[in-house]
């Protein structure tokens, strides 16, 4: 075993760092390359910054080109309509007779 130089920092000691640089490969050999590779690749833990997901903003020009929603009459609820409908003449005759009562 080689004697350790007390003047060197622990991360610069011989054998403390692998001979090859870290890479982006996720094979088994590269996952066990060093402790950093193992935590990043093997365990999937990274302590870097998280990128914010940007929201899609609509530009002002695209908002001007939007067509307004046309107003449509409310649809009648479905069902048997024969009993609900009365002729206009019946309704008019009832309203005129109610006015004189």
UniProtKB/Swiss-Prot annotation:
Keyword field: Acetylation, Activator, AIDS, Apoptosis, Host cytoplasm, Host nucleus, Host-virus interaction, Inhibition of host innate immune response by virus, Inhibition of host interferon signaling pathway by virus, Interferon antiviral system evasion, Isopeptide bond, Metal-binding, Methylation, Modulation of host chromatin by virus, Modulation of host PP1 activity by virus, Phosphoprotein, RNA-binding, Secreted, Transcription, Transcription regulation, Ubl conjugation, Viral immunoevasion, Zinc
Residue positions of motif Nuclear localization signal, RNA-binding (TAR), and protein transduction: 49-57
InterPro entries assigned: IV_Tat, Tat_dom_sf
A Gene Ontology term for the protein's cellular component: host cell nucleolus
Processing and modification events after translation: Asymmetrical arginine methylation by host PRMT6 seems to diminish the transactivation capacity of Tat and affects the interaction with host CCNT1. Polyubiquitination by host MDM2 does not target Tat to degradation, but activates its transactivation function and fosters interaction with CCNT1 and TAR RNA.
Region listing for Transactivation, in residue ranges: 1-48
Annotated region described as Cysteine-rich, given as residue ranges: 22-37
Places the protein is found: Host nucleus, Host nucleolus; Host cytoplasm; Secreted
Any one GO MF annotation of this record: protein domain specific binding
Principal location: host cell
Region (Interaction with the host capping enzyme RNGTT): 49-86
Sites bearing Asymmetric dimethylarginine, chain numbering: 52
Region (Core): 38-48
N6-acetyllysine modification, residue list: 28, 51
Region entry Disordered, spans: 48-101
Annotated region (Interaction with human CREBBP), positions in chain: 1-24
Segments crossing the lipid bilayer: none
Superkingdom of source: Viruses
Residues noted as binding Zn(2+) 1 in the record, renumbered to the chain: 22, 33-34, 37
Glycyl lysine isopeptide (Lys-Gly) (interchain with G-Cter in ubiquitin) cross-link site: 71
Keyword Transcription regulation in record: yes
Family classification: Belongs to the lentiviruses Tat family.
HAMAP family, sorted: HIV_TAT (MF_04079)
Further facts: HIV-1 lineages are divided in three main groups, M (for Major), O (for Outlier), and N (for New, or Non-M, Non-O). The vast majority of strains found worldwide belong to the group M. Group O seems to be endemic to and largely confined to Cameroon and neighboring countries in West Central Africa, where these viruses represent a small minority of HIV-1 strains. The group N is represented by a limited number of isolates from Cameroonian persons. The group M is further subdivided in 9 clades or subtypes (A to D, F to H, J and K).
Protein's name according to its UniProt entry: Protein Tat
Source species of the chain: Simian immunodeficiency virus (isolate MB66) (SIV-cpz)
Origin organism lineage: Viruses, Riboviria, Pararnavirae, Artverviricota, Revtraviricetes
């Amino acid at each position: 075993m080689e004697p350790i130089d007390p003047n060197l920092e622990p991360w610069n000691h011989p054998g403390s760092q692998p001979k090859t640089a870290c890479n982006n490969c996720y094979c088994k050999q590269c996952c066990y390359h060093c402790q950093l590779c193992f935590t990043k690749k093997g365990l999937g833990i990274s302590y870097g910054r998280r990128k914010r997901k940007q929201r899609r903003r609509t530009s002002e020009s695209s908002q001007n080109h939007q067509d307004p929603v046309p107003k449509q009459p409310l649809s009648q609820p479905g069902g048997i309509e024969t009993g609900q409908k009365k002729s206009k003449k019946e309704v008019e005759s009832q309203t005129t007779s109610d006015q004189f009562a």
